Amino acid sequence: MPQVCVDASVVVARLIFDEQRQNAEALWTRWQREQVIPFGPPLLYAEVPSVLRQAVFLGRITLEEGELAFGIFCDMGIAVSERTDLHLAAWEMARVHNQRRLYDCIYLAAAQAEGCDLWTGDRRLVNAVNLPWVRWLGQEVV
């Protein structure tokens, strides 16, 4: 089955009211219809709950909304890359693309290792790396 790598911004956009929520929902619906398996590096399972918790802490969403979103995330069934060498490829990608944050490059490395697209809500990352398989959530998806 085909795969697609998703970063935390795409998942969070689907879970809480966000300007990209409609696009995230449309993508997820398309992937389900086309039997595409969304996956991410293990980092995804730390980053998404952290973003949700921060949204609660800062008052962007209520505690109840945060707990609901966290529960939905836990039930989404996003596959996890089992590769143990992503940090090595990510370090090199950060060097090549002059990125200061390695965690963005871990998602890039996961997608590259599987030979699939990476979907992100981070336009800055898309523009910085300028790779054809790095897709921005804000682009036309339907």
List where the protein language model places each region.
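Active-site neighborhoods of divalent-metal-dependent phosphate/nucleic-acid chemistry enzymes
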Residues: 77-121
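Short, well-structured N-terminal submotif of metal-dependent ribonuclease cores
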Residues: 1-43, 55-68, 141-142
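Short, conserved alpha-helical segments within structured domains
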Residues: 41-45, 65, 86-89, 107
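Short glycine/serine- and small hydrophobic-enriched flexible loop segments
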Residues: 50-57, 113
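A general alpha-helix detector
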Residues: 10-11, 47-51, 69-72, 89-90
